[in-house]
Structures are given as C-alpha cells and as structure tokens.
Amino acid sequence: MSESNKKRFSLTQRLVLAVVPRIVWALFSIAGRTWRFEVIAEEGVEPCLQGQKSGNYICCFWHQCVLPCTVYFCASHAVILISQSFDGELITRILRLFGYNAVRGSSTRGGREGLLGLKHTLDQGGTAIFTADGPVGPIYRTKMGPVKLAQLSGKPLGAFHLEPEHAWRLNSWDHFLIPKPFTRIVVSWAQWTEVPTDLPDDGFEAKREELNAALERARARAYAHLGKAVE
C-alpha cells in the first residue's frame, strides 16, 4: 500500500482493503457465472451485449447496480469513474480484480481530474462508465458530471438499468442490489442522449434532465418486464 493511502486510511480500513476485495471477487466470480442476463431495449437502440467490447461512448447507470454491472461489462475494457473516498478505494480494488481500470474522482471530490481522465479514455477510443447518482445520491437523480463529459468529449450518453428478478436490497442510500445466485437479470437500455460540444451554459440542466428521464425509463421498463411495481 502506498504511503499516501497509509495516511488517508485507518488501520482497520487498511485491513479491510487488504482482505475484502479478494473475498468479494471470489464470491461474485462464482455467483456471477450463475446469473442469466436478458437484454431489452427501446426501439432503435443497439445495446452493448455481455462479452463484447464496448464502443466509443459513455454508459450511465444507477449506483445500486454496481455489482451486476461489474459482471456484465467485465469483458468490455471499459473505464469507470470511482470516488476518492474509502468506499471508492474499496470498489476500485474489487474492479481491478475483475479486469477494469478506474479513474478516481466524483462530484464531491476530485471531479475535474476524474472528468479529464475519462475524456482521455474516450479520446483513445475507449468506453467510459458513470454511476449517474453516485457517490452519495440522492438516489435516482443524475449528477451533472456525465453531461459535462459528453460536452467535453463529443460522445453520446447511453442509459441502462440492471434489475435482478431476485436480489438482496441493502438498507443504504442507493438500495444497493446483490443479485441472488441463479437469478435472471434484465438489462434494459434506453435511447441515447446527444450533447453538443458547443452546448451553452443554460442548456446543461435540460440535458441532465433528459439523461435522468432515460435512466428512469430504462428502470421502469426492466421492472415491467419482470412484472414488478416500480419502487
């Protein structure tokens, strides 16, 4: 562990960071092989399928879907923005074991550095992934970061939701989802959001709302496909 991390985290936190990522990786590497992903999409939308390399765009989803998203996209070579908090460090170490790279930053800390890191990924032809309401909510409310990245890079914003048929739902701000073994997971894609590179300052909020609406349509469609009532 680097000297900077020794200063940032307590002894207990450092022990957690040393042990927990490998346990989580082992458990969900096994459990993830039992999950059955079913992809649906709005008319005219070409989704990114499990096992294929993603395209040159920005994908957005709600923070509660991190675990199923990690398994679904593990072959995509995507780069994800993770906060600089302790929780972010923990998630980063888990994602590295699944083969991801992470850019550190968030809407609350290191945001500019994070956006520039993701822009570099997009400039190199890669895929960027955003937890749209992370790192601390409020739930189901998109932050401005994805829209700013789309405006900087000229790349479109994809909106999707992963809804397990059977899952444990944690009592956290995001109602974090842990899919149960052998469950079906619906991957629901909505229409893309295009953001002009010359978007004026007074146009950002409308684009944020457009992306938020797409994410909520994707979530509602997944719930309906499973016969669930939207929470």
For each predicted feature, which ranges?
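Generic beta-sheet signal
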Residues: 105, 131, 159-162
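Catalytic-site beta-strand/loop segments enriched in glycine and acidic/polar residues
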Residues: 117-153
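A cross-family acyltransferase "interaction/gating" segment
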Residues: 3, 141-201
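A conditional alpha-helix N-cap/helix-loop micro-motif detector
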Residues: 108-112, 139
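Short, charged beta->alpha transition segments
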Residues: 88-92, 113-120
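Membrane-anchoring hydrophobic helices of lipid-metabolizing enzymes
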Residues: 1-76, 92, 209-231
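Catalytic core of membrane glycerolipid acyltransferases/transacylases, capturing the structured
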Residues: 56-109, 153, 169
